[in-house]
Amino acid sequence: MIGCLIAGCTRTLMSRKTYNHIQVVLRLCDVHLPSWKTVQSAKTQLQKMTHCKKYKSLSVIGNPMTTVSIQGLLKQELGNPIVAKYLDFYPENSKGENIYKLSQCEKWLHQYPRDLRAQMIRVGDQSFYIYEPAQIIDRNVVVPLYFYNKGNKLWAKVCKLNVLVLPSSLVELSISGDLNFYSSNMKDIMAEEFLKPYHEITFNDGRPLKSICRNELYEITPERTEIIKLPNPWRLKAQGRMIRHVPLSIYSDDTSGNLSKQWNKHISIFMSLAGLPPHISNQEYNTLFVATSNIATALELAAPVVEELNILSTSGFFTFDHSLQEDVLVLPVILMFLGDSPMHAEITSTLHPNVSLQPCRICKLKAKNKKDKATGTYVDNFIGRNTNGILVKPNLRSWIDTKKAAYHTWYLVQRGAPKTQVQSCISEFGVKDVLNQTIIHTIKENQDTKVTYNIRRLQDDSIEKLFNPFYELKGFDGHKDTPVEVLHVILLGIVKYLYRDLICGLTVDKKEELVARFQSFDISNLNIPSIKAKYLVQHYSSLVGKDFKIIIQAAPFVFFTIIEESRQKIWISLCHLCSLIFQTHISCLENYVANLNSFTQDFLIKLISSNAQWVNKPKFHILLHLSQSVARFGPASLFATEKFESYNGVVRQASIHSNRQSPSQDIANSFMNFSAIRYCLSGGNCISETNVSIVSPSYQVKNLLLKNPTIQNLLGLDSYIFKVKPRELKASAQTQTGSI
């Protein structure tokens, strides 16, 4: 373990040459390190003992990829004593109040389909499942449809069970099929009120209910009747074990694999556990690497990830849960996909916003041509109003329609339609499946290759593999589950545009005055060491997100004597809006969303009134949809990407120490080494070398992390969590609102 730590991980990776140099120097001091080969062998063995696995695959167009097993990563997380105790496995019904974590979001609470919700609760030694009849303490039989937390206790949303006695002495069980979480026909009951599960309920004459209902439950709506088989399929899969519901936040981005300015593009995929409170999940320690490639596109790289997620969300997997000290069945599902605007456009099969006549991935904002963008109708639509200036609800895109449009384009090509007709179809629907278009190009350029043969085979057997894999991802709606991300839309978008516009309009004297005002600005409440005033003014075109955070907070105090009144109004409105957007705690969601919409409209109207050419920047429009993202997921800080962006540096370090023969595999192996070391130092149980017993790290190994701030920092872990209990940490998170 000592040799592995010296060889480094994440940001401190060491080359073989440097390690050998240190080994020789320490040998002079009679300190003997294991050889480099021994260290690498130990890392490989440690991977096997800590559930680490990787999968090699070829993309549909033949690019090799290596993906770290999501199942292995989740086994580590639930077996990790540091992580498991903080995880939420049930959504929390906060009733729109005191929202600060993802487990309180509306999607997790009630917007998953039936088979992807939290499936069961345990009361005593009994397990109760959704869409199964259950008897409660007043002897009535109900059907739970949702399980959730409220006030640190488990609750259920249940509906009435209708029983029809048939002439054959059998019974027909039915429930209403048009019930949602907030329906007046739903009832809230505490978990302790459940008495008997489905298989123990008896009918009036003493016969077991399961023997006379044909194990069927009818869900009836005016339009259809659906037969639900009993018992819940997850009861059979769980085999008496607890089921852990684990939503995931997935992120993808491109970064350079070089330290130099020469661009060496690597597409990477990371994830984090949505059940962790933000104070924990925002630590680098809890960012999980999944895959990277310097040749495959984001959709190619995502294909094996989506495939594994679908398998896991269908069948689950067994692992040890450290918080329960027992084996559990894990049900992982996707909660959201994070990325910048170009990445979101690729994932949602929409056109790149900067050059498109349909620049929004969420709604159907459209201009017929470039000249149409200069019309009043388009400007009104851009800020969410009709031609009379009245606010209107946006015409939202449909994920199903997007998939249909992509397939329609493919079939046009297969029928030999001219290129102009295909391009016209893409423009009409605003849908461009990048993976499918790449496949079309590959077929045209390489008629007789092995890749083309494989594509033709898939067209007959598994045509869905020729399209965006996210179409098939269970529980994912590309247009709803790609929330408006504030780093790229607000800081690196709106604030950057307006600041550059401001600086370009200043004289030399005004710029000097601005520098002086920045220098005299009191930063005692900004939690930053200093303001680089000259840098902010002279290098305004090279600023990064943290610089714009400083600028937007200083703007009300340093800008207003050097700009005209019309710009002052825009900046005042933007400052009000940003002070709302960057709140990490929402006391009342309904009021917050209403205020957010109001401030957004105020800002956009003042902006467009000053210069309507801002409609050429799609990020001003996408701001309109931020309130929808907040209503679905909670405070914007919960889907911020800074923690993932900073992790790009770790990928870069791993790339530098790759042999460059197979970067995807080398980098994946490097992160698996880190994952194994992290898990072992955290005190997770390991599989013995003979694979027949479980071994726990010694207290000396655990103390390397628990009592050593340097090692904690090495792994990206804040030592604060060792000083407080989980409940105290959660309580403190509820009371903090955080500055920008």
Question: What kind of region is each of these model predictions?
Answer:
Residues 261-265, 283-286, 348, 372-376, ...:
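Short coil/turn segments at secondary-structure boundaries
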Residues 31, 257-259, 278-281, 298, ...:
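Eukaryotic short linear interaction motifs
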Residues 22, 253, 305, 360, ...:
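Short, conserved catalytic/metal-binding motifs centered on acidic residues
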